Curated annotation (Swiss-Prot):
Its main location: secreted. Keywords: Acute phase, Amyloid, HDL, Secreted, Signal. It comes from Mesocricetus auratus. InterPro entries: Serum_amyloid_A, Synovial_Prolif_Regulator. The gene is SAA3. It is linked to Reactive, secondary amyloidosis is characterized by the extracellular accumulation in various tissues of the SAA protein. These deposits are highly insoluble and resistant to proteolysis; they disrupt tissue structure and compromise function. This is Serum amyloid A-3 protein. Belongs to the SAA family.
Amino acid sequence: MKPFLAIIFCFLILGVDSQRWFQFMKEAGQGSTDMWRAYSDMREANWKNSDKYFHARGNYDAAKRGPGGAWAAKVISDAREGIQRFTGRGAADSRADQFANKWGRSGKDPNHFRPAGLPSKY
């Protein structure tokens, strides 16, 4: 029953046609992986003022996957910012994060937010 409801959700709510919903779900999964990779790299780098870069990069990589990746990036970014606002994080920082998220999802170069000295590994 749950898989059936997920399919109906994709058709009705997400507006995905029957020929592309498998592709959409694949892109969403890959986009989620891209977002996780950016988060993991941010934690590993532990570099001052690098969070906007990693936000933009995760969204950029996910959106390159296609509509499913862009959808996953938006859902994950919005949820993350919503949780952080709820826990008392500053509204100005949240707006700046959302700006970086949208920048990356729109296909603009995430290196715009890259801090000086961040190792080339990232």
